[in-house]
């Protein structure tokens, strides 16, 4: 409560300052750019990072590429295409993560009124850790999408045993990827939503909604901040709190069917939550 009260005080001070800014001033221009990209999160980010620095880390465009995305690519170029690399060297968390994901998925697929088991899409797939252990045992075919070609090349070796069920590998950043219309029973998005701006996450979730078959669902699994929004400078990602995340989900035209906190992770870890989402057209 103390944090939220301090944030609202900060919000009021900033909005008053913003109202008084010259519409042609540098501060107004930078603020407008950040607010456009992080409309749900930007005031939390401005609490911790000065305006000019935040702009340089996120919304500034250099050589046609937004720095928030360019810096993430640089980070992942140094990540090895291994399970350890996919888990950020916390390989001991892979097993409880997989077990919880398998259990959560079973609640929403198979049977009347549930998602089918024909085709799934693994978003931000990396080498295919989730595909191998969670999706391929359930679905007739799986597709992978990731921005790193090196990860997708390794995925073909990593998934070799079940490779005949892998329909295709898409080398795209998620902000540039559009799932084919009504193709998937399940779209799995894990530990990658924080690499999208608020604007692009909202748009991507909307496109994923259109990519679902009848009764199809989206599984969103990610770190959820306890309060506000946190920018990780090391990998250029944001961790949003529950209110911010659910607001973006709602605005994308999706409804939360169920949510569950990941068990078995150390207390000092940022909480991880799983959400099952479907189109509000089915509500």
Swiss-Prot record:
GO terms for cellular component: cytoplasm; nucleus. Its main location: nucleus. It holds the Pfam family Methyltransf_PK. S-adenosyl-L-methionine binds at residues 124, 129, 146, 174-175, 190, 195. It is found in: Nucleus. One of its GO terms (molecular function) is N-terminal protein N-methyltransferase activity. InterPro entries: MeTrfase_NTM1, SAM-dependent_MTases_sf. Keywords: Methyltransferase, Nucleus, S-adenosyl-L-methionine, Transferase. The keyword Transferase applies. Its EC number is 2.1.1.299. One of its GO terms (biological process) is N-terminal protein amino acid methylation. It catalyses: N-terminal L-alanyl-L-prolyl-L-lysyl-[protein] + S-adenosyl-L-methionine = N-terminal N-methyl-L-alanyl-L-prolyl-L-lysyl-[protein] + S-adenosyl-L-homocysteine + H(+); N-terminal L-prolyl-L-prolyl-L-lysyl-[protein] + S-adenosyl-L-methionine = N-terminal N-methyl-L-prolyl-L-prolyl-L-lysyl-[protein] + S-adenosyl-L-homocysteine + H(+); N-terminal L-seryl-L-prolyl-L-lysyl-[protein] + S-adenosyl-L-methionine = N-terminal N-methyl-L-seryl-L-prolyl-L-lysyl-[protein] + S-adenosyl-L-homocysteine + H(+). CDD domains: AdoMet_MTases (cd02440). Belongs to the methyltransferase superfamily. NTM1 family. Alpha N-methyltransferase that methylates the N-terminus of target proteins containing the N-terminal motif [Ala/Pro/Ser]-Pro-Lys when the initiator Met is cleaved. Specifically catalyzes monomethylation of exposed alpha-amino group of Ala or Ser residue in the [Ala/Ser]-Pro-Lys motif and Pro in the Pro-Pro-Lys motif. Predominantly functions as a mono-methyltransferase but is also able to di-/tri-methylate the GPKRIA peptide and di-methylate the PPKRIA peptide (in vitro). May activate NTMT1 by priming its substrates for trimethylation. This is N-terminal Xaa-Pro-Lys N-methyltransferase 2. It comes from Homo sapiens (Human). The gene is NTMT2.
């Amino acid at each position: 409560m103390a944090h939220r009260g301090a944030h609202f005080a900060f919000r009021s001070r900033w909005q008053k300052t913003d109202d008084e800014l010259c519409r042609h001033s540098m501060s107004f221009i930078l603020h407008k750019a950040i607010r456009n990209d992080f409309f749900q999160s930007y005031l939390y980010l401005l609490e911790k990072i000065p305006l000019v620095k935040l702009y340089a880390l996120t919304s500034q465009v250099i050589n046609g590429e937004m720095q928030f995305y360019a810096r993430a690519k640089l980070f992942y170029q140094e990540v090895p295409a291994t399970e350890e690399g996919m888990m950020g060297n916390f390989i001991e968390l892979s097993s409880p993560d997989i077990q919880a994901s398998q259990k959560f998925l079973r609640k929403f697929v198979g049977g009347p009124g549930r998602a089918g088991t024909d085709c799934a899409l693994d978003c931000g797939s990396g080498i295919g850790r989730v595909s191998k252990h969670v999706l391929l045992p359930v679905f007739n075919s799986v597709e992978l999408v990731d921005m790193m070609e090196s990860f997708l090349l390794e995925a073909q070796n990593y998934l070799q045993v079940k490779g005949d069920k892998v329909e295709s590998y898409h080398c795209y950043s998620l902000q540039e990827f559009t799932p084919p219309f009504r193709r998937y029973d399940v779209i799995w998005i894990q530990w990658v939503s924080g690499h999208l701006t608020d604007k692009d996450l909202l748009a991507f979730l909307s496109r994923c909604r259109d990519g679902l078959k009848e009764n199809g669902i989206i599984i969103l699994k990610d770190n959820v901040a306890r309060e506000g929004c946190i920018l990780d400078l090391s990998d250029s990602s944001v961790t949003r709190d529950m209110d911010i995340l659910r607001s973006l989900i709602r605005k994308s035209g999706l409804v939360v069917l169920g949510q569950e906190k990941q068990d078995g992770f150390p207390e000092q870890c940022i909480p991880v939550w799983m959400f099952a989402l479907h189109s509000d057209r089915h509500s």
